[in-house]
Amino acid sequence: MELIIISGRSGAGKSVALRALEDIGYYCVDNLPIDLLPQLADILSQSQASAAISLDIRNLPNSSQHLDEILTELENKHQIKIIFLDADRSTLIRRYSDSRRLHPLSVQNQDLSLEAAIDAEQIQLDPLIQHANLIIDTAVLSTHELAERLREFLRGNSDKELKIVVESFGFKYGLPLDADYVFDVRFLPNPHWNPSLRPMTGLEQPVIDFLSKYEDVANFIYTTRNYIETWLPMLERNNRSYLTIAIGCTGGKHRSVYIAQQLGEYFQDKGKHVKIQHKSLEKHKNR
């Protein structure tokens, strides 16, 4: 039986993910104690071809060794995939503020603040993250986009085409959680120090003109795209659904935006399925 285990940080979207899997034909069980998982999987395998089960922090064992033993037992009998949903700390805090719900660890310990509960959960979930086949950063995904990402990972599409995401980000806001490759461009010339360019972004022509005149910038783009092109065929043969390439500068406004755009457009011109996104630009718009 195909068994999908959905887990992740509280507030990252496990319930949404489980509903999405139910919509594409998985038999779904929400929030099962992990000690019951092998027995339930054996029962379901008699009548179901595929099932999805969500696990949250309250139902995981205290021992990482015990977790390893349970997952090994399942892998010996079933086709297991573990999907871990994640989001950055500020996104989780905002979601809890919007929903006005308590974090599961705050329910167990009312003296625990939301921030402390989020941090404690991250530590406790670390052993499970090590087993994940897919980690999805839900901070920038709509409900529909999360459902589509899950569908493509599990069901694929007719041509099995690798989807490439090239994204810019600012290191001051933290590393992207879903990146396969991270390139740091903070050593390149910075338009921020030019007062006329500071309010602009790497998508605007004056900034493009500023960066494109530097040989170091051109060399970085050239060597980075060559590196990706060298290994892309092997990544495509590895039956991956997504490849996420993250380009980071200090604020995610100038250098990383320009270079991510250049790389993304290059691979689009090569006929690859590429999505370009600029994760930190929205933060600058809201200032």
Swiss-Prot record:
Claim: GTP-binding is one of the keywords in the record: yes
Keyword rRNA-binding: no
Signal peptide: none
Binding-site residues, GTP: D56, I57, R58, N59
SUPFAM superfamilies listed in its UniProt record: P-loop containing nucleoside triphosphate hydrolases (SSF52540)
GO molecular function, one term: GTP binding
Disulfide bonds: none
Highest taxon, organism lineage: Bacteria
Keywords, ordered alphabetically: ATP-binding, GTP-binding, Nucleotide-binding
Residues reported in the UniProt entry to bind ATP: G8, R9, S10, G11, A12, G13, K14, S15
Function: Displays ATPase and GTPase activities.
Family recorded in the similarity comment: Belongs to the RapZ-like family.
Protein known as: Nucleotide-binding protein Asuc_0930
Organism of derivation: Actinobacillus succinogenes (strain ATCC 55618 / DSM 22257 / CCUG 43843 / 130Z)
Source species taxonomy: Bacteria, Pseudomonadati, Pseudomonadota, Gammaproteobacteria, Pasteurellales
